[in-house]
Amino acid sequence: MNSPLPDITATDEWSALKDNAKSIESTTLRDLFANDQDRAKNLSFSVADLHVDLSKNLINDDTLTALIALAKKADLEDHREAMFSGRHINSTEDRAVLHTALRLPAEESLHVDEQNVAADVHDVLARMRDFAHALRSGEWLGVTGHTIKTVVNIGIGGSDLGPAMTTQALRSFATAGISGRFVSNVDPADFTSKVADLDPAETLFVVASKTFTTQETLANAHAARRWFLDSLHLEDGTDEANDAIAKHFVAVSTNAEKVSEFGIDTNNMFGFWDWVGGRYSVDSAIGLSLMAVVGPQNFMSFLEGFHAVDEHFRNTPLEKNVPVLMGLLGVWYDDFLGAQSHAVLPYSQDLARFPAYLQQLTMESNGKSVRIDGTPVTAPTGEIYWGEPGTNGQHAFFQLLHQGTQLVPADFIGFATPNDDLPTADGTGSMHDLLMSNFFAQTKVLAFGKTADEITAEGVDPSIVPHKVMPGNRPTTTILAPALTPSVLGQLIALYEHIVFTEGTIWSINSFDQWGVELGKKQAGELLPAVTGEKGVDTGDASTDSLISWYRENRK
């Protein structure tokens, strides 16, 4: 029997951070900046096109030194190399973790389990490019001879969130007249609302399911099949219907038998691999709908952005390694300063779905309570990720960030040049500049606040002064980029992927399985006969029995 893992919380490095936390709690960001004129310069970093300012975080030099020491104690560098080299670090499923291989340049090779996975990746990319070119050029025609104008991606989880988020984020790069829509929820309203105004003759469905057995995805895929055939007055099972299905449905899957049974030509099936987790798969064939909308060249630029951050993460010393530092800050706030959530605030409407995407990436990865050896964790793990685009969030939940009792570290993401801009009301200014003035103001006020003396000096009624005090000392990280391009989007996603890896390594958890998700799916299948009335209500607990009985009595 293997000996249990060392307990990171019992180390001198952990103790040093506990001591440092006491020191940090007795200081302020105002003091930290006043005592170090070079703080902003020393705590600003570059990774590819991203400018990352960590200076408004609740840290001092001793904090960073202790966090780096903790990373080394946890063998972060060795674990990082194990991932990049293809070792089976997903221990519960005995799999390599190689999303980084999805964006390797064509001239590189990576042999894992006696297979050149880089060559396999580029074989699939070549087929994806051919498919996207055919759609975008009008070479691919539907059953009535019309070109395809809408690609509807049917998937769930990583097979939906990634393509949906990135297609919205890169809408400015959709130039071929093809739009993307995304269906994920098994709630029928999701499918019916997404296809209500579509012409089936000009619609193509991408069914994304690795096993082609995912309950929600297959339910929506069959709904799409019925809608498509009924709309074109085709009888299912006829040669004419089968020909139509083959021209309007493609699959992202590895189960050729199931794909063929559905009626999809397996020549139009795009595969991926067990070493790609769903939440890390947007740059695999799961991104087929994105490539169709923005084009192969932009998709390859997207991959190049990922790879640039991969190289930074793999090769940069820990002290200047941006995803490492941001991951260590996550551990710092979670385990030493008592934060339980993390806000992501993109000042870009195009990134409206980015916080939701990060919810799956971070919470499905690091929402674990046992370590890789099966023993309980000894410190809090994971953070609740949430957020909305600015300035919407300012008028919704920023009040809590500024004056509430919760410590909520926040990442602000902004861009120097917008993909869209309009003049201000007087016609002399830029709405993007107005947006970014709010961006900079929020990080400033969160950090430095406003004291009672400063408010009193403005002549405010003394009884109101306490209500207007802004305590400040609310930590933020600022991420700026020249513009939201395919490459920059890839860089942002890779940045957070490696933040997740860093945190998971410190906590000694497996960031690449999701057994909590699996059990829920299994239970749903077992309960379905009781829900539909095919069998009696006897689920094993009185609450669930009562709820299903109420549902059946009120179901119309």
UniProtKB/Swiss-Prot annotation:
Keywords: Cytoplasm, Gluconeogenesis, Glycolysis, Isomerase. Its EC number is 5.3.1.9. Pfam families: PGI. InterPro entries: G6P_Isomerase, G6P_Isomerase_C, Phosphoglucose_isomerase_CS, SIS_dom_sf, SIS_PGI_1, SIS_PGI_2. Transmembrane segments: none annotated. SUPFAM superfamilies: SIS domain. It catalyses: alpha-D-glucose 6-phosphate = beta-D-fructose 6-phosphate. GO terms for cellular component: cytosol. The keyword Plastid does not apply. Its main location: cytoplasm. The active site is at E364 (proton donor), H395, K521. The keyword Transferase does not apply. It is found in: Cytoplasm. Pathway: Carbohydrate biosynthesis; gluconeogenesis; Carbohydrate degradation; glycolysis; D-glyceraldehyde 3-phosphate and glycerone phosphate from D-glucose: step 2/4. Belongs to the GPI family. Catalyzes the reversible isomerization of glucose-6-phosphate to fructose-6-phosphate. This is Glucose-6-phosphate isomerase. It comes from Corynebacterium kroppenstedtii (strain DSM 44385 / JCM 11950 / CIP 105744 / CCUG 35717).
